[in-house]
Amino acid sequence: MCNHDHPLFQKKEKESKDERTVHDQEHLLWNRRSFIQALGLVGGGSMMLGSHTVSATKPSPLSVALAESENDHILVIIRLEGGNDGLNTIVPVYDYASYANLRPTIRHQQSDLLNLNADFAIPNYMNALESVWGDGNMKVVHGVGYPQQNLSHFRSTDIWASTADTYEEPTGWWGRYFEDLYPDYLINPPEIPPAVQIGNVGNLIFDGNNNNYAFTVANLEQLQNVAENGTLHDVVNIPDCVYGDKLLFMRATANTTFLYAETIHDAYTAASNNADYGEGDLGQQLSAVARLIKGGLGTKVYMVSLGSFDTHANQPERHQELLQDLSNSIKAFYEDLAVSGMDDKVLGMTISEFGRRPYENGSDGTDHGAASPVMLFGAGLNGSGFVGEHPDINEWDANDNLIPTNDFRDVYNSVLTNWFCLDPSVINTILLNQSYEILDLGIECQTLSTNDFSNVNRFSHVPVYKNNTVYLEMNVPSAGRGTIVLYDLVGREIGTIANQLFFEGRHSIDIKEAIGKRLSFGQYIYRISLGGQHYSKSLMIK
């Protein structure tokens, strides 16, 4: 993590050149996931499997039933990248003296504040949100964070994305949901992208164990290119050599960009904007999201980002520019949606990897901290207000950070339960089987599932590992002829596991024995065709 976040450095008012260099180096670190996402090549939806060109087809019956049990609500996650300073966003005027004492230089003057109620205010340059609040379309959850706050940008971002704060979990909370919803996603992807992500390079929020479930572009320009032209990169002219195989692998495992290009294009061109978004970065992203929503794309989750919240120095000017962009963009976004009567169907939610320290540093800024507010927007909130207790700005933890009063996973749990009306068992999977509170956000689930799951195809399949042998175990609900084919990750056919009549009941197949030849160690994909449906999953040969 950044050196200046260590307790040994927390009292220094100025950072040394070496310390700042370490901080800058951390921001320049890229991993393989970041590199691929920066190219706009993200996702795992479409690939060549042998002679089969996999394209957008209808989801499995179970996926359809699960999808139909949901409502028509949409979530737009707005990531404030870098760690937003909550005290200068939602100002605690109930204890203005303490606030001003901690921040003699960067504080907001009382004359420059717009009161939301008697206790809390926003800076006057966020005045675009004054009407949003007044119309009952804004909630603020106080003091959001988690225990033993990690002060590294990258680790804390992963914690917010994965929900795991005590170990490194490789999947994201939305990735786990979509992995459960689309178990055969590799070969039978849904007709619409499960999620759309602009920027946030390297974020694992939509990562499953084997796929990224978001249509992801590195920036707005790439999204506009796809939306307006229907294409992004060439996937046909790939050389027939080792390099070509590697290039094909990277593009094949990231081909949702191409898979959904036409769908994105159709939705984008079917609608137009009916609000002035200005020239801000976030505003332009949200204007594109609004067109996709109004154009009937059908995607349930979007994520956009606004960067540069890491305000170690010269915070007043930088923070003002960012919060103005946020405020103006939110107002325009919901004005735009209201024209189509969709402002009550879309919930906006800000997240940030951490807050800032309660006191200013010696560079007209603030250093990495802990608790910070989460803001929610939309007519579906049924009134504006504050949720939970505000942290005591005079009571800090051992690292001089505000003590969180609400867990960020409580916010997630509340949205999943009362906005998307998901079944508790599904939410348990999403939140790694941990229990969290449900906050009073003003939203209440009004949708009950009316689907009869007794008629859903109960076919199941799973690889089982026993004594250095890999078995494919299946439960077949009704007899039928089926084929099972094994592929490597590039999509080359390795061999046929089975081509036979499967009787009703349980089946266990020894993969190595069925293939009849030596298999190299590594990951493979099997594809089952049975009863007019296709299923796939990865397995490991050890």
Kindly label every feature range from the protein language model:
Residues 5-7, 92-98, 107-127, 311-447:
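Feature marks hydrolase-like catalytic cores characterized by long aromatic- and Gly/Pro-rich stretches
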Residues 28, 34-59:
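N-terminal export signals
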Residues 238-332, 336:
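Anion-binding catalytic surfaces of enzymes that hydrolyze or transfer phosphate/sulfate esters
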Residues 501-504, 512-513, 517-542:
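C-terminal tail/sorting-segment detector
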Residues 1-30, 477, 515:
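N-terminal secretory signal peptides
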Residues 443-469, 475-477:
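Residue-level detector of functionally pivotal "anchor" positions at catalytic/ligand-binding pockets or at interdomain
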Residues 49-87, 95, 455, 493:
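C-terminal segment of N-terminal export signals and the immediately downstream linker at the start
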Residues 119-227:
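Extracytoplasmic mature domains of secreted/periplasmic and thylakoid-lumen proteins
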